[in-house]
Amino acid sequence: MSSVVFASARLNATNQSYLPVPITLATAYEMQHGDSLRLKTSHGLKIKIRIKEAASTLYMTTGWKEFAEATGLETGETILFRMSSRSKARVMLLNRQCLIRCPVKTPSTTSSDKNRSLSPSDQLTRASTSAHPSTSKSIPPLRNGTGSTKRSIADTSFCHQLKLTAEN
């Protein structure tokens, strides 16, 4: 098939280790048990997923959990697939409010944190407080050593290196 196909899936509690292949993708590319699919984000993350069939349904199995963990996918979030071939899909992640978000793996430091994902604002707070041991509410100096405490949106965004482009 030469045309691009789009599909989406919402992550729920039952599909964190595997994800049913959206019917649109399965039928458009005649996917079957044993196929491989390479998922790629706009940030360069590439993970190979294996397709398996169970009870007449195709599932993304081996590699899916790794992809979900690497991108920080949480229950209620949506993944959009843009497939232009049978074995490759570009993906975009949407948070619970259906806003595009960067695939950011949440760092965890203790065993209790491993089961809990932080929101981007919590990650920003944790990153800024751990980078500056002061108990005051001041903003730590920029990395360029100017000592300036002025910040731009780009400085505080996890997606500051993301370049949006229109694809034809």
From Swiss-Prot:
Biased composition, class Polar residues, residue ranges: 106-138
One function term, GO molecular function aspect: DNA binding
Pfam families: B3 (PF02362)
Keywords: DNA-binding, Nucleus, Transcription, Transcription regulation
Region (Disordered): 105-151
Main location: nucleus
InterPro entries assigned: B3_DNA-bd, DNA-bd_pseudobarrel_sf
Transmembrane segments: none
Name of the protein this chain belongs to: Putative B3 domain-containing protein Os10g0158600
Organism per entry: Oryza sativa subsp. japonica (Rice)
